[in-house]
């Protein structure tokens, strides 16, 4: 693994292109229109605004894999709207923080691209494997907020009847706001999973499509374009330098024989594959408290990869367990970065402990989703096995 050239790896060229796509969508105000349209369309559901926020987060996550961007934008857009509507602060905070973390799992995820490079796996199969787990987690979040608001309406009051526009206007908003962005997402993912384009090529098409959407919404301004380019360059540089530093540490660790010691320790324990999976996921969970996902992937995942083969675990299934597990690194106090992103944009309106309390139920849902996927591996493996059957 360590003999490969990293910085000229063609798969990594997709990272800045997907970032550019996400920042264009954000700066063009497309996400705000999307949230408004979904909020109107789901007004009959309990916690309709929370449902709209989670759906918007899931869709926006397909355009950008940067957690901070999603949580920050939704913290400025959806959180104040929910509070004005009478939503409980802890409940609203949990929705924004958990929904904003979906970008690390739902493809085309930057984390999955980096994982593909490290583990030498097919990014196409990883994307296919992540679709159903990502939808499952988003669906569990939505189901939770609906059930909780149904039994405790004070958490998320229903909108007044006079606030709901006619059906024709709702349909118009959905067609104008939801359909174009959803079509762009389907185009990007469809070309990747259909084998018509590499992730980098699909990202380039998506970035061009975002420019077209910005023009369509009359928000294609030089200021927005310049900010998108600057933020893309800044975030790409941050990711690449984290990559270089973490990879250097991992290379030295491997050269000094650290991997062999770790492997021999595990092999000497005489454990079953399921025990190996439980131990590794506990380790990843604990590492998520002090470390970013890049350090976890680049430093520790290469240690586990030979053991994955030794215990006969499907590498794509293992990757999906880690991807789900890394959700917890953004939700687990005291280093729950999503909470600090939200606190940063709403510092005067919510206490950090309120955010932490709101996050806890969603953290439990992530752990439940991991158990569910472990019990039913087909959630992750059916689609890639079907699409790429040899």
Language model: regions and residue ranges:
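Alpha-helical transmembrane segments of multi-pass membrane transport proteins
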Residues: 3-390
């Amino acid at each position: 693994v360590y003999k490969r050239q990293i910085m000229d790896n063609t798969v990594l060229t997709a990272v800045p292109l997907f970032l550019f796509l996400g920042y264009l969508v954000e700066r063009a105000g497309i996400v705000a229109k999307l949230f408004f349209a979904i909020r109107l369309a789901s007004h009959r559901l309990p916690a309709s605004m929370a449902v709209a926020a989670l759906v918007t987060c899931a869709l926006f996550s397909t355009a950008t894999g940067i957690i901070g961007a999603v949580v920050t934008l939704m913290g400025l857009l959806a959180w104040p709207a929910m509070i004005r509507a009478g939503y409980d602060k802890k409940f609203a905070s949990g929705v924004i923080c958990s929904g904003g973390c979906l970008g690390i799992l739902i493809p085309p995820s930057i984390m999955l691209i980096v994982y593909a490079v490290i583990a030498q796996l097919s990014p196409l199969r990883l994307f296919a494997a992540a679709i159903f787990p990502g939808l499952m987690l988003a669906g569990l979040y939505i189901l939770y907020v609906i059930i909780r608001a149904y039994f405790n309406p004070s958490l998320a009051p229903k909108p007044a009847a006079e606030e709901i526009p006619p059906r024709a206007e709702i349909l118009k908003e959905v067609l104008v706001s939801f359909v174009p962005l959803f079509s762009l997402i389907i185009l990007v993912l469809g070309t990747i999973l259909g084998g018509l384009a590499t992730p980098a090529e699909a990202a380039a098409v998506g970035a061009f499509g975002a420019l077209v959407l910005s023009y369509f919404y009359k928000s294609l301004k030089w200021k927005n374009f310049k900010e998108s380019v600057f933020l893309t360059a800044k975030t790409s540089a941050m990711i690449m330098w984290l990559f270089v530093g973490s990879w250097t540490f991992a290379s030295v660790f491997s050269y000094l024989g650290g991997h062999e010691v770790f492997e021999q320790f595990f092999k000497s324990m005489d454990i079953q594959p399921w025990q190996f999976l439980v131990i590794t996921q506990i380790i990843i969970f604990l590492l998520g408290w002090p470390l970013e996902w890049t350090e976890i992937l680049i430093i520790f995942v290469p240690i586990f990869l030979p053991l994955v083969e030794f215990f006969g675990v499907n590498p794509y299934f293992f990757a999906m367990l880690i991807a789900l597990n890394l959700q917890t690194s953004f939700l687990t106090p005291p280093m729950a970065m999503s909470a600090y992103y939200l606190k940063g944009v709403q510092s005067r309106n919510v206490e950090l402990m309120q955010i932490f309390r709101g996050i806890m139920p969603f953290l439990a849902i992530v752990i439940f989703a991991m158990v569910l996927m472990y019990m039913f591996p087909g959630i992750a493996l059916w689609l890639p096995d079907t699409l790429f059957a040899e």
